[in-house]
Amino acid sequence: MAALTMAACGNKEESSSSKEQAVREAMGDYLVKEIGAHYLQGELCVPTLMIVAGEENGDETQVWCDCWVDWYRVAGDTLKTVSGGNHSGLMTIRMQDGKPVVTAFEQTTDGAGFLPSAKRIFGQHFDVYERMHASQDVRDAARKEQLKEYVSRRGLNVSYYQDYGWDAVEL
């Protein structure tokens, strides 16, 4: 459920995996640049991607997702949350100059319009989205796993993350 799965057959599996990673990177870059820019900024902006479903059609990929964008500041060995929020919806990704780029992001609305917009956007994937979105355990596990990967890839000397008013969580 939390992995973007693209069709792969025979020896195309490796290229499918690298394409999946490239799509995830495009999604993360979009969230940091286009969404993260609207939050109070810290030192690091880290998106958490929870993929509900993905479909490919030629050079276009559609990804239904439940994403979080969080800004952190580094305090010793801890990432302390500065700001952030949830951004659920449908991302459209197209190949441009040989790499995937997010070209559209239709998001759910806040408040009273949330449920109708989520049902419309997620359509046949709504039940999966609803279970994922409603589960704090799923969100916490995805966030922890993806933060751990982020810290490792960048060689940061960080062992914990901490939301304001909560205990630090070990990565």
Residues covered by each model-derived region:
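Sec-dependent N-terminal signal peptides
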Residues: 1-2
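C-terminal motif of bacterial Sec signal peptides marking the signal peptidase cleavage site
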Residues: 5-8
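N-terminal export/targeting and maturation segments
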Residues: 11-69
